[in-house]
Amino acid sequence: MTHWPSPAKLNLFLYITGQRADGYHTLQTLFQFLDYGDTLHIEPRRDGEIHLLTPVNGVENEDNLIVRAARLLMKIASESGRLPAGSGADISIEKRLPMGGGLGGGSSNAATVLVALNHLWQCGLSIDELATLGLTLGADVPVFVRGHAAFAEGVGEILTPVNPPEKWYLVAHPGVSIPTPVIFKDPQLPRNTPKRSIDTLLKCEFSNDCEVIARKRFREVDAALSWLLEYAPSRLTGTGACVFAEFDTESCARQVLEQAPEWLNAFVAKGVNLSPLHRELL
């Protein structure tokens, strides 16, 4: 049995710069990983079967991104003659990241499966090839595949590696799940934030265009942010529902965590520019 990190991410900022004819929104965002997340346990099989041993409530196994990623890699590697005969896997997950939380849990799971099975099956696909596969599963999957903090543009697929400060974060989940379409379909969502260079953006105060909508539509998010803002700069990650506050030291973050209200599910983690998944491969 092998064990593989599936880390969370934060959007340190997120700006919506437009909307394409196909309905997808264009954006500029800054991804950084956390040293916290799910863990995937993978045991290779020799009969070509993919088994997910820990089903997710409300999600059929064949619809789960873990299974979809495994089957996609199997298909592409087989078609290109790079899949050893009988390659399969038993996969289980220790789930720590909430669904609909804006921490990238499902995308991270898919990326970990692609990277881990490519290694375990010895398929030999490059990171570029894996990232291309990942994009067909979700816009956030490539950044997890590539494994480095990044400035993202387009619909999130154009990635430029960056090295923002690795701060400590208190991340709080207010107990609601926010489906991404709920935010992106809101008529009041800002959709015309001017594009700026990464150098300019890094010098500005960070914010998230989705935050005003999430706070308006979900009182739990509004309450969580109102509480966090009493202690430190805080904002929404992704389309929510998780919010985070940044600190210079772990001790400062933990002092605030000790005061968290009971209705908040919160944890402290360090921002890291190299994904824990890729540290595992070094």
UniProtKB/Swiss-Prot annotation:
A Pfam family the protein falls into: GHMP_kinases_N
**How does the annotation summarize its subunit structure?**
Homodimer.
Name used for this protein in its record: 4-diphosphocytidyl-2-C-methyl-D-erythritol kinase
What GO molecular functions are on record for this protein?
Answer: 4-(cytidine 5'-diphospho)-2-C-methyl-D-erythritol kinase activity; ATP binding
Q: Where does ATP bind?
A: P98, M99, G100, G101, G102, L103, G104, G105, G106, S107, S108
Q: Summarize the protein's role.
A: Catalyzes the phosphorylation of the position 2 hydroxy group of 4-diphosphocytidyl-2C-methyl-D-erythritol.
Among the record's GO biological process terms, what is one?
A: isopentenyl diphosphate biosynthetic process, methylerythritol 4-phosphate pathway
Per UniProt, which keywords does this protein have?
Answer: ATP-binding, Isoprene biosynthesis, Kinase, Nucleotide-binding, Transferase
> Carries keyword Kinase?
yes
Q: Which InterPro entries match?
A: GHMP_kinase_C_dom, GHMP_kinase_C_sf, GHMP_kinase_N_dom, IspE, Ribosomal_Su5_D2-typ_SF, Ribsml_uS5_D2-typ_fold_subgr
Q: In which pathway does it act?
A: Isoprenoid biosynthesis; isopentenyl diphosphate biosynthesis via DXP pathway; isopentenyl diphosphate from 1-deoxy-D-xylulose 5-phosphate: step 3/6
- By its UniProt entry, which NCBIfam families does this protein fall under? ispE
What catalytic activity does the UniProt entry give for this protein? 4-CDP-2-C-methyl-D-erythritol + ATP = 4-CDP-2-C-methyl-D-erythritol 2-phosphate + ADP + H(+)
SUPFAM superfamilies reported in the protein's UniProt record: GHMP Kinase, C-terminal domain, Ribosomal protein S5 domain 2-like
Q: What is its EC number?
A: 2.7.1.148
Q: Which HAMAP family match?
A: IspE
Presence of the UniProt keyword ATP-binding in the record: yes
Family note: Belongs to the GHMP kinase family. IspE subfamily.
Location of the active site: K9, D140
